[in-house]
Structure formats: structure tokens, C-alpha cells
Amino acid sequence: MESLVLGGDLGGTSTRILVVGTDGREHGLSTGDGGNPISRPAGAAAALGDALQRALAGVDPGQVQASVIGVAGWSALRTPVVAAQFAEVWADAGLTCDPGYRSDLEVAFAAGTPEPDGTVLVAGTGATAGAVTGHRLTRTADGHGWLLGDDGSGFWLGREAVRAALRSLDAGEPHGRLAGSVLAALDAAGTADRGRDRVIQVVYSHPPVQLAALAPLVSAAYHDGDPQARSIVERAAAALLATVGRVREEGQGTPIVLAGSLTRDTPVGATLRTLLSARFSGPILPARTGVGGAAWLALAALDPALATPATHSRLCR
């Protein structure tokens, strides 16, 4: 009976499960709803359980000999009540091996490189960086959430865009590209007083993290040459650079893996890569599919000899 391994990536927006053989060949794959065990433990456990059931539909769960699952907010799994919820869905899926829950930073790093040591930055709705040694997270910076940190994140960009629009209203200035697009998105066109009141009303009527939805407006205005957008992009990239600098020493030649929507083909991502190249040595690599990185780490957990560069290339396309 062939041994299989399972990789998982449980994030706030989606959950992915991948089951592969020892050669990296796919035996099962599923994608479903996301969930964070810190904010929605029951929902996160249910999302994981559903994804597990579908990924394992065509295989014997008893064949799965090792697993690694990256979890955003994985520290919540140390809480007995949350751990019990996750243990229940794991057992219901017929799995008997250890789930191998890990920080999503470790999985993101493995999704970008087979190297054991280096630095990873995840910048999407939130932002956090980590130092990785021997494929395990040893230090972190930021990731403190929208109220206390996540500097340079999608939330941060959205908040700065709204603040720029409010300053424009306060000053009675003609609206630039960024301010105009923010006011339109918030249905806050009109007089300065009406605009300010409407912006405040709309923003405070939604969860704060939803400000991240305005981040693309910053990118669009940047491409149109808006000076406010340019300033926000430059400050965001500088903040992310500083976050990396808190976990990485200058002179290290190990890889820097970038994950998350902001690090891709965006003005912040491009500016950040320029800043990183100027300050640090070592290759700057994009994270590929997170679930592939998790499956590759699961192969290493089963037998380090299986976690080859070839299987990494197959899984992390």
C-alpha cells in the first residue's frame, strides 16, 4: 500500500488540501472556505473538515502517513476548546497521523524555496515577517493586527487612502485621483461637510479590516501619477522593509520569500523588491502555491530524502 502525505493551507479566505504520493504525484485536491481559529474557531474547524473530506474522497485515509497544515492564527490551536474542535474534524476524516499544524509563515517560506533557512514576508490584508531556520520559524515581526500593527498591509493602505481623502476635504482642495476614487467608493461625493460625515459613517459601520478593500484604489491612483498615492506606496514599502529588517541581518545570503497579494505585481511589491535588493543580499523569491509547500514539508516529515528539489518544483509550481 502506497504511503501518502497531506498538505494543507488554512487561511482567512480559503482552505486548500493536497494529498500526494511519495513522488509528489497528486492523489486528491480540494479548495473551500477559509477561517481563522483566533476569530472564528468553529468556522475554521468546519472549513478544514469539509476540505479534508473532499480531498480524501478517492483515497484511503489510512494511507496518509504524514501531514503539515499551515494555519493563519495557529497559536489558537493551543487552546483546549479550539484544539478539541480541530481534533474532531481530523478524526471524522479518518486520519490517524499527526496533523502537523504549523504557522502559515513556515508554509509560505517552503512554497518559495526548498532551502531550509531564510526570511519570509507575508503582506496581504495584514503583514508579518519571520526568520526560518531548518524549515521552522524562529523569530517574527509585526503581524500584530490592524489596531496595533500590520504596517504596510492592505488594511494600512486602505486606511491611509481614507485619511488622505479626509485631509483633502478638510483643506477644501480639489480632489486628486486617489481622493476622488475613495470618495466615490464610499458614496461620499458632495460638499466637504457631507463628504466627511459620509466617509466617517460608512467606515465606522463596517469591520475595520474591510478597509483593505480600498487598497487597489491606491495602486490605480499611483499608476495615474497621483502624489498622495505615490507617498502611500513609498511609505508602505518602507514599513514592510523595516519589518523584514527586524528579523534579518544585513549580509545574510539566504533567500527572502515574498507572499501575499501586495508582494505581487503591485506598486508596493515593485517598490519593496527594489528596497530589499538595495539593503539585503540573497535571492528574492515569490511564494508559489502554499498547499504545495505544505505537502513538500509533509514529505520531509515522512522521510527527509523525499523532500528533493525535484519534488519541490513539482509541488510548488
Regions found by a protein language model. Give the residues of each.
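Glycine/charged-rich beta-loop-alpha catalytic/anionic-binding loops adjacent to active sites
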Residues: 88-95, 137-145, 274-282
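Glycine-rich phosphate-binding loop of actin/hexokinase-like ATP-binding domains
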Residues: 116-168
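ATP-binding/phosphotransfer module of carbohydrate and carboxylate kinases, centering on a glycine-rich
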Residues: 1-63, 111-119, 162-317
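Short glycine-aspartate micro-motif
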Residues: 5-9, 66-68, 100, 118-122, ...
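A short glycine/serine-rich beta->alpha loop
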Residues: 37-38, 73-74, 143-151, 280-285
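Short beta-strand-loop/turn "lid" adjacent to the catalytic site in phosphate-handling enzymes
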Residues: 36, 55-93, 100-101, 110-114
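Conserved phosphate-binding catalytic cores of ATP/NTP-utilizing and phosphoryl-transfer enzymes
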Residues: 1, 92, 96-120, 137
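N-terminal loops that bind phosphate or other acidic moieties
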Residues: 72-75, 123, 224, 268
